[in-house]
Amino acid sequence: MGHRISTQSRGKGGPTYRAPSHQYKAELKHFGSALETVRATVIDIEHDPARHTPIAVVKIEGKASDKKEYALITEGVGIGQELVWGPEATVVNGNSLPLSAIPTGVAVCNIEARPGDGGKFVRSSGVQAVIIGKSAGKVGVRMPSGKPKWFNEACLATVGLVAGGGRIDKPILKAGKQYHKMKTSATRWPRVRGVAMNVIDHPFGGGGHQHPGKPKTVARGASPGRKVGSVAARRTGYRR
């Protein structure tokens, strides 16, 4: 019976490669819209295994439910602060309002791709986008990558930058720290090179020294255990 290599295990998608979504606390979306204003008060700040940024537990004004409501927050938002979503919100840190109501040059985050979808862009810890212009029902935003992107003016966005900035500034220092960090995500770590494996574990494994021992190019229709290296490569080597 053949030996299943790590590439095939990843394709099967076992627990090691699946995101721990059963631990996620909530799907964070805007509570209001371009036509409806919602107010809430931050009552606590918690950690969510789904992301690297802290999230806020909020109490929606006029809502009697005891169910916890969560919101994505910006840097500087604290317990007891009022957050507002909708057209009546003012342009202050933490509030969410239509892009048409946000002045040019203001930093924003958690931008909707389409009005009412709850927020899709600029949601990672410490990131921000900047309003750069408005034209014919569209609002231009400079994304964290530096590229401009145009959105419908009715899309909601949160004023400020996402909380949790500076997270990657602290060095890992120890492999054990990195191990536990990677265990929280759908990533297998460390990633071992094929030439460093035994011959049974990878087509490039084994031998007296580390080398593939065969051409790295492989056909598109190769069997799963062989399909490693340069798959269906048009060319290999350095360009001249």
UniProtKB/Swiss-Prot annotation:
A Gene Ontology cellular-component term = cytosolic large ribosomal subunit
Q: Which SUPFAM superfamilies match?
A: Nucleic acid-binding proteins, Translation proteins SH3-like domain
Question: Which intervals carry biased composition (Polar residues)?
Answer: 1-10
Q: How does it assemble?
A: Part of the 50S ribosomal subunit. Forms a bridge to the 30S subunit in the 70S ribosome.
* UniProt-listed PANTHER family: LARGE RIBOSOMAL SUBUNIT PROTEIN UL2, RIBOSOMAL PROTEIN L2
NCBIfam families xref list: PRK09612.1 (NF007180)
**Record function comment:** One of the primary rRNA binding proteins. Required for association of the 30S and 50S subunits to form the 70S ribosome, for tRNA binding and peptide bond formation. It has been suggested to have peptidyltransferase activity; this is somewhat controversial. Makes several contacts with the 16S rRNA in the 70S ribosome.
Question: What name has this protein been given in UniProt?
Answer: Large ribosomal subunit protein uL2
- Give the species: Methanocorpusculum labreanum (strain ATCC 43576 / DSM 4855 / Z)
